[in-house]
């Protein structure tokens, strides 16, 4: 098997653990505390990586304007996204939050049409319709919709997906070296989460096995998986095939949540996921041909 496929598979397996890992941590640790500590760990790992590889020298070539843009990207794309997603995870089951999180590629299509002036085609509209049908199916059971926490959890996950979709479009326009920009972005996320967390939460000491969870989230999921994914795409002869493999992640995430959190895999969740991911794949496979 080619190395890029091994990198891609490794990344997908790591990403699939995110919902269950965060959900388990949020049982005992406030949302923004978990986000702040894991983000600083991700920043430190990427800092060491960039120093070791010599990439850190390139940071001098960036102007204050560049750092302002990168910081803005970090605030919108990963601080707001993560804070909202963590809140959604705390209110919903991990499978519900994970599925709603995968609306971000559809949000990317919407923002690409608005910001990049890409053409809205019938295929894109059909893809959006499929994904929003998935939202309706997912929201139609698994608890009382009159429950304000559930409604807020659903809204938070949808807005989080919109933030990440917007980030993906703006990041594409910015075109910075991702190893350096992600290092700065995780620092920004850590600082924002630290400030907001200290103002709004009562933080608790991190003990024993909780540090393993923090390291897994901050270093492995936030940093290592990103680097592996970049290597997978860089070494691929067919980037589209590798990119589409990422949509296995939510399906694997359902299985991992069922094993480690004892969450029952509900039929409506699977059907909703098929609609949402089906809409994304429809756009990816046929969207370009229709333009």
Regions found by a protein language model. Name each.
Residues 1-38, 144-173, 189-195, 256, ...:
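Glycine-/small-residue-enriched transmembrane alpha-helix faces in small-molecule transporters
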Residues 3-13, 57-84, 152-160, 205-224, ...:
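Loop-to-transmembrane-helix transition segments
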Residues 13-16, 20, 74-79, 83, ...:
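Hydrophobic/small/kink-forming positions within alpha-helical transmembrane segments
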Residues 18-19, 47, 53-95, 137, ...:
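Specific transmembrane alpha-helical segments of multi-pass solute transporters/efflux pumps
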Residues 25, 34, 38, 88, ...:
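Hydrophobic/aromatic residues within transmembrane alpha-helices
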Residues 35-37, 96-103, 171-190, 222-259:
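Helix-helix packing/entry segments at the starts of transmembrane helices
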Residues 45, 50, 104-129, 250-270:
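C-terminal transmembrane-helix exit sites in multi-pass transporters
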Residues 46, 111, 120-142, 160-161, ...:
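Hydrophobic transmembrane alpha-helices of multi-pass small-molecule transport proteins
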């Amino acid at each position: 098997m080619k190395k890029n496929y091994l990198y891609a598979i490794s990344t997908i397996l790591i990403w699939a653990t995110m919902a269950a890992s965060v959900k388990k941590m949020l049982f005992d640790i406030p949302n923004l505390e978990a986000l702040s500590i894991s983000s600083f760990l991700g920043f430190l790992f990427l800092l060491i990586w960039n120093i070791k590889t010599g990439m850190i020298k390139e940071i001098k070539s960036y102007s204050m304007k560049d750092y302002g843009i990168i910081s803005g990207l970090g605030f919108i794309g990963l601080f707001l996204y993560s804070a909202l997603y963590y809140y959604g995870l705390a209110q919903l089951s991990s499978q519900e939050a994970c599925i709603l999180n995968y609306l971000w590629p559809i949000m990317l299509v919407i923002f690409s049409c608005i910001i990049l002036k890409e053409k809205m085609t019938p295929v894109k509209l059909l893809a959006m319709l499929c994904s929003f049908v998935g939202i309706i199916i997912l929201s139609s059971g698994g608890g009382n919709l009159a429950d304000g926490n559930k409604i807020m959890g659903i809204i938070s996950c949808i807005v989080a997906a919109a933030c990440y979709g917007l980030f993906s479009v703006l990041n594409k326009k910015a075109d910075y070296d991702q190893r350096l920009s992600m290092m700065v972005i995780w620092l920004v996320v850590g600082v924002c989460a630290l400030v907001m967390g200290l103002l709004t939460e009562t933080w608790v000491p991190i003990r024993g096995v909780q540090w393993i969870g923090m390291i897994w989230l901050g270093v492995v999921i936030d940093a290592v998986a990103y680097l592996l994914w970049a290597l997978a795409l860089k070494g691929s002869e067919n980037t589209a095939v590798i990119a589409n493999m990422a949509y296995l992640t939510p399906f694997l995430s359902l299985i991992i949540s069922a094993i480690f959190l004892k969450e029952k895999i509900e039929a409506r969740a699977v059907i909703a996921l098929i609609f949402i991911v089906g809409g994304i794949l429809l756009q990816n496979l046929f969207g370009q041909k229709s333009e």
